Amino acid sequence: ILEKIASDPEDNEVKGVEIRLWEKIKTKAREGRRTGVGITAEGDMLAALGLRYGSDEAVDFSVDIHKQLAVAAYGSSVVLAKERGAFKIFDVEREKNNPFIARLKEASPEMYQEMVKYGRRNIACLTIAPTGTTSLMTQTTSGIEPVFLPVYKRRRKVNPNDKNVHVDFTDEMGDAYEEFIVFHHKFAIWME
């Protein structure tokens, strides 16, 4: 990125702002080694297990899953710190009153003691990122939420001059679309 900015035609004064920004990003990334293990399709998992979204049983099950995921992710980061060293700005004292770290300590006292001794390789190990496109590709729910709609209508832009094209909708700009019905993959399996 810095090489690309250097080759840009703008004057150095203009480029300096962007260069300083990217240098700060690079420094912070190296100091913390942020990473993120996350989930997708949890809503489908709950449905497949017959657990109603929002029920006490489903909430308890999800809490347990996320607790196991957190302990495994942070435990792996501790193992890496033992082998390669902790992230640069790791300081166990700064985290001693952190509620999340307290929950990790309660869930796995052994892992916590190793973390105190060796640190972690990564400042953060979990993420719940937006997975809308990924869930469309994998035909699953995007997270813990249930399916928004088990059946919905999609539009695909088409060239009306193509052979054998079917135009169902034309927008105010004159763009043509074919419409088709989509069934959520797991819902379609359930219907069979």
Please annotate each region the language model reported.
Residues 1-192:
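Long, C-terminal-biased catalytic regions of enzyme "large/alpha" subunits
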